From Swiss-Prot:
Descriptive protein name: ATP synthase subunit a
Location of the protein in the cell: Cell inner membrane
Pfam families to which the protein is assigned, alphabetical: ATP-synt_A (PF00119)
Key words, A-Z: ATP synthesis, Cell inner membrane, Cell membrane, CF(0), Hydrogen ion transport, Ion transport, Membrane, Transmembrane, Transmembrane helix, Transport
Keyword Cell inner membrane: yes
This protein's encoding gene: atpB
Source species: Ectopseudomonas mendocina (strain ymp)
GO molecular function terms noted in the UniProt entry: proton-transporting ATP synthase activity, rotational mechanism
Similarity comment: family membership: Belongs to the ATPase A chain family.
Subunit structure and binding partners: F-type ATPases have 2 components, CF(1) - the catalytic core - and CF(0) - the membrane proton channel. CF(1) has five subunits: alpha(3), beta(3), gamma(1), delta(1), epsilon(1). CF(0) has three main subunits: a(1), b(2) and c(9-12). The alpha and beta chains form an alternating ring which encloses part of the gamma chain. CF(1) is attached to CF(0) by a central stalk formed by the gamma and epsilon chains, while a peripheral stalk is formed by the delta and b chains.
Amino acid sequence: MADTPAEYIQHHLQNLVYGSHPEKGWIIAQTPEEVKAMGFWAVHVDTLGWSLFMGLIFITLFRMAAKKAVTGVPSGLQNMAEMCIEFVQGIVKDTFHGKNPLVAPLALTIFVWVFLMNSLKWIPVDYIPGLAHAMGLPYFKIVPTADPNGTFGISLGVFLLIIFYSIKVKGVGGFTKELSFTPFNHWALIPFNLFLEIIGLLTKPLSLALRLFGNMYAGEVVFILIALLPFYVQWGLNVPWAIFHILVIPLQAFIFMVLTVVYLSAAHEDHH
């Protein structure tokens, strides 16, 4: 797959990209130069595929738990599902102060889905890329949250919900008034208020996406660097780093979920 450490690192950090090349048409990019030539609308096939696959696993597991729910002794899968639901419901109850029955299911979906995508980091870094290379694919990353396209996609969805509920709860006029007269309630400071509020609004999806991406990407880079070391050294570093990620992986999913609930709670607050 790679002859030098630099090529090895570049290979493992490059996504499988499909797009329109100005000279070759619609192709799977074989080099970083081809990826660059494809431009903004190129598709990261691995990120999209693994995101959908983890979402399907989430739906399948919770659907199975719901179908097998019994009044007697619950199964292990049912216990896991109930623990997740009760945990998320507790967070939403303490954090969200509006009235919206969709917030708790949304928070549950975000928490479990992001956790499942993060958990792909536990798969050794060479396994899936090596298998993909044997199948003729030049690149293949398996952690969707280590790709900014994946994290920005989720955070953009959250951002659209923030705007939607802000307008739905407060009305167009109320939302505009909030942007215009916060934090300083004077007409002369409306331009300054709008500047501050719009910047603050735009930083919400930005912070959500970059926080998750930064942590997952950095962890992936460390795993790749460890894989470059001699075999007898790898285990001594891989095991502690993997154990550390037992905390990092659910923590990042939790932070993403909590911030989403906090932002939606603010969107439901009517200041009239």
